[in-house]
Amino acid sequence: MAMQVKTRPAPTPDDLVDLARRHFIRGERLDVAGLGEELGISRATAYRWAGNEETLTGRVIASLAEATFRRCVKEARGKGLDKVLDAERRGLRYMASFAPYRAFLEREDAMTSMRIVASKDGPVQPLQIRQHEEWLRELVESGEIELSVDPHTMAYALVRTAEAFLYADLIAGEDMDIDKAIAVMRLLLR
């Protein structure tokens, strides 16, 4: 009788992103070649799957931001605009206090980090706008809220307001202030 050898399934691009997420959460800078080696794939394959470090970091942050948004919406208290503002407050507080994210912002130069998280060319901002737009549209269609502009425009305004106050230290030398962000959002949503 022949002995069966169990083989590990071949790694996939998703495995690389999952491994990168674990490294990011430990507060480590992502190194595509090192991650590829850890996963048992060639450097060329790792770069083909991930792009460069900046692209991979953006994918990881986008995946974390997506999950955070869903959780904040689910946990939001209140009705109507209060519910929207509670979800926004929860998201901003989480991002401001998430040590691996703050480590990333402190480690990278401001231009690089903003290009990843607060630019139309990065993966995070377009995702955030899309998620906000979909949620706002659902709330409008269900009659829970009324907006003075279309859901896309409001989503864009809310995301950019969040960025302005969450990253105030990086982009304007101001102190981060979540309460001010929520106050401005309240004015936008009236």
Predicted feature descriptions by range:
Residues 24-29, 47-59:
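HTH DNA-binding helix-turn interface
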Residues 34-38, 46:
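Append "Primarily bacterial transcriptional regulators
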Residues 96-119:
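Amphipathic alpha-helical segments used for helix-helix packing
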Residues 1-6, 93, 130, 134-142, ...:
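C-terminal peripheral helix-coil segments that are non-catalytic and often amphipathic
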Residues 10-34:
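Short, amphipathic alpha-helix enriched in basic
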